[in-house]
């Protein structure tokens, strides 16, 4: 880690020619100055203190019933927990592949480093409310996720066929998911514990993953994949 919670390779939003905000990547930090590169090839610099990555978490959920005041879900419960600890959850309930692609794109362009997927899963698929999405389709919808950590509570997606393909295809910094079937109650518990370690204790995603796995080895059986 360099700077104040900034990493080389972080995706940030930075002004260019004082006109607009453009997505950029930190390339080097020195003497309190951040150097960054835009997608169109332009480069710029500015004080690192103006380029703080957000504590946003993109929460994308798809279950059989849309959460309400009387019906709670893992994703909605996680969102309330994140607010309690000072993070900024961006919750979206989806039903279709098209909606999944839309919100993955928003997450990809965001300064957020974290994406959370709350839905059913199979060996090589995410199961949405109205359709199933194969891992290859998920990769195509997600695009370039370098600099992002993706936590999935979807059953069975922590197997090699899904996890290794996902990080290889998207370039995500990490993909964390249960290898076996997991109850929603356990999914809610381990996801909250993971983000508590991440945001409150300031540890890395891998350290948070190891902590959760050691605490609940049988209930979660989480796997950690990286490129």
Predicted regions and their residues:
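A domain-level signal for caspase-like cysteine endopeptidase catalytic cores
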Residues: 52-114, 152-153
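Caspase-like cysteine protease fold
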Residues: 53, 57, 131-142, 200-227
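Basic/aromatic-rich interaction segments and small domains that mediate binding to polyanionic partners
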Residues: 11, 15-47
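Mixed-charge, Lys/Arg-rich low-complexity intrinsically disordered regions
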Residues: 1-8
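Short acidic, S/G/P-rich loop/turn micro-motifs used as interaction or catalytic elements
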Residues: 64-69, 97-99, 121-125, 156-159, ...
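Catalytic cores of nucleophile-dependent amide-cleaving enzymes
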Residues: 128-191
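Active-site proximal helix-loop segment of RNase H-like, two-metal nucleases, encompassing DDE(D)
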Residues: 189-202
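Active-site microenvironments of hydrolase-like enzyme catalytic domains
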Residues: 113-126, 169-174
